[in-house]
């Protein structure tokens, strides 16, 4: 299980998708779980702390079941709370946490939907990084700042970390 966490616009999904493709190229069975895509299927999940917590735990449970059946799971979710991510870590046989720590200023610059601006104007509440906290991982396996490296460089670092941590390759 490779779990990407970070602010909206940090580059989590971009790098995660690239890593998933690299793993598929190696012949691995891979499933990509993206937080936004899952929310589109289950729109009743809101953004309060308890709803976010439940969402992360549900996705984590699904990921753990896929992992149990031999699928390499690549998940990309904001997953802002350390406790939720630690819960998911406990469900999985292997858990590689990738903290995409791109500065909020860069995340805002990349925000094509204008969500950060809406949150700053008070039009959106409970927006992670603005009026809801993001709890950075205490001991992630890897920290990436995508404002300082290309997608290829970030993906290569993830692949190195996976191989070292999980023994893939």
How would you name each of these model-derived features?
Residues 101-104, 109-157, 164-169:
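Small-molecule kinase domains that catalyze NTP-dependent phosphoryl transfer to phosphate-bearing small molecules
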Residues 8:
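The conserved Walker
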Residues 4:
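Hydrophobic anchor at the beta1->P-loop junction of P-loop NTPases
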Residues 12:
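Conserved lysine of the Walker
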Residues 41, 45-48, 63-120, 126, ...:
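ATP-dependent NMP and nucleoside kinases share a basic, alpha-helical "lid"
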Residues 1:
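Walker A (P-loop) ATP-phosphate-binding motif of ABC ATPase nucleotide-binding domains
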Residues 17-64, 68:
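Conserved substrate/cofactor phosphate-moiety recognition/catalytic segment
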């Amino acid at each position: 299980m490779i779990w990407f966490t970070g602010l909206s616009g940090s580059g989590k999904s971009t790098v995660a998708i690239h890593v998933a493709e690299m793993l598929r190229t190696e012949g691995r069975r891979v499933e990509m779980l993206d937080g936004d895509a899952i929310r589109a299927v289950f729109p009743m999940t809101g953004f309060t702390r308890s709803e976010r917590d439940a969402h992360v735990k549900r996705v984590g449970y699904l990921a753990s079941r896929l992992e149990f059946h031999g699928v390499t799971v690549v998940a990309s979710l904001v997953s802002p709370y350390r406790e939720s991510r630690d819960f998911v870590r406990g469900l999985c046989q292997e858990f590689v946490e990738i903290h995409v720590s791109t500065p909020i200023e860069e995340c805002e610059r990349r925000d094509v939907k204008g969500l950060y601006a809406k949150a700053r104007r008070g039009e959106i509440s409970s927006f992670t990084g603005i009026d809801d906290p993001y709890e950075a991982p205490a001991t992630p396996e890897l920290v990436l700042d995508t404002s300082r490296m290309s997608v290829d460089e970030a993906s290569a670092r993830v692949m190195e970390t996976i191989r070292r941590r999980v023994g893939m390759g």
